[in-house]
Amino acid sequence: MRRTLKAVGAAAAAATCVLAATAGTAQAEAPKAESLYAPSALVLTVGQGENAESAAVERAVTLTCAPRPGGTHPSAAAACAELAKVNGQFARLVGASSDAICTKEWRPVTVSVVGAWNGKHVNWTSTFANQCTMKAGLGEGAALTF
């Protein structure tokens, strides 16, 4: 019994020493830069509701543009190119389409973008009267149509 207690005590002491030694080593390492690019990682959502906080999210995608396009966005490369053209100003992607015929039904749809664009925090939303006005306002652009 005494031998067992001594063996368990010695094993616990050895484990503590190993953990202390590796923890000290991990803290001493300097963080390495992963990229020379400013981060451009976004979460884009479309939801039913008057504002982003209360909208029931129907679709959501991720979009990463630097160093190369990626994420779950179905057209990541085209979306990144479109955002680069407007310098990440999402409001410039929304316009009025004069040839669209939409009902006056009030069933609000909110599009939101949260994340970082070229290293700057982004928190943008736009609310449309219904799905038809959203599609008309977003047009054929790739960034906000997913």
UniProtKB/Swiss-Prot annotation:
Which of UniProt's keywords are assigned here?
Disulfide bond, Protease inhibitor, Secreted, Serine protease inhibitor, Signal
Q: Where is the signal peptide?
A: 1-28
The record, for Gene3D superfamilies, names:
Subtilisin inhibitor-like (3.30.350.10)
Please give the start and end residues of each transmembrane region.
Answer: none
Database matches in PROSITE patterns: SSI
Quaternary state and interactors = Homodimer.
* Protein name as annotated: Subtilisin inhibitor
**Native species:** Streptomyces violaceus (Streptomyces venezuelae)
Gene name?
A: vsi
